[in-house]
A protein has these predicted regions:
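Hydrophobic alpha-helical transmembrane segments of multipass integral membrane proteins
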Residues: 1-7, 48-61, 79-86, 103-106, ...
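Transmembrane helix-loop-helix hairpins at membrane boundaries of multipass inner-membrane proteins
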Residues: 1-62, 66-76, 150-166
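Short, solvent-exposed coil/turn segments
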Residues: 35, 44, 123, 172-174
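Alpha-helical multi-pass transmembrane bundles of energy-transducing inner-membrane proteins
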Residues: 10-14, 73-80, 84-172
Length: 182
């Protein structure tokens, strides 16, 4: 329901003429020496991804409503997974985005490993190891973007406005982040 409300609020802001890059923006400094901030906001793509994720979470909730063993624990991990996904889509800061990506990793392992079927332990371990390996590529890519841009912040909007990452470095950092997310 909140995602539908957010979508209508976003569309209302855009139709009212608000042309800001990101709407409903909030910034709080987490770690001042590296200028890492909790920066969140939405644009058209993130609103669409939030709405799709909300539909999937809503469907997943009702599909598992009558789950018997460890129901409370299941919904705790499912909520934490949802938080990681939603947080990832609203993140503007590279570090915050990476943290939300990692937050979703442990709940996926437990949801598959405990409540899955078939070779659930094998599947959960294989997925977790692959995602952790991808996280290493992603972290290297994020750090490369940060240091390669010469930015004083990990804010994606500010890094994008600098336009100073050389093409040769872009050819290195993009595949690493792509592999990390893939």
């Amino acid at each position: 329901i909140a995602s539908v409300v957010l979508t209508f609020m976003y569309l209302g802001e855009r139709s009212a003429g608000n042309t800001a890059e990101m709407l409903f923006r909030a910034d709080t400094v987490w770690y001042a020496p590296l200028n890492i901030a909790y920066s969140v906001g939405v644009d058209g793509i993130s609103v669409a991804m939030l709405l799709l994720s909300a539909i999937i979470v809503f469907t997943g909730t009702f599909a598992s409503w009558r789950l018997q063993p460890l129901t409370k624990e299941y919904f705790l991990w499912f909520t934490l997974l949802s938080m990681g996904v939603f947080g990832f889509f609203i993140s503007i800061d590279l570090f915050t985005m990476f943290m939300f990506y990692e937050i979703a990793l442990i709940p996926m392992y437990l949801l598959i490993g405990v409540w899955g079927s078939g070779r659930k332990e094998y599947a959960a371990m294989k997925l977790t190891l692959m995602l952790m390996g991808g996280s290493a590529f992603l972290l290297i890519g994020i750090l490369g973007i940060y240091f390669g841009s010469g930015a004083t912040t990990m804010n994606l909007l500010e890094i994008a406005q600098l336009h100073n990452i050389p093409f040769a470095q872009q050819c290195i950092w993009f595949p690493l982040t792509f592999l990390g997310f893939g």
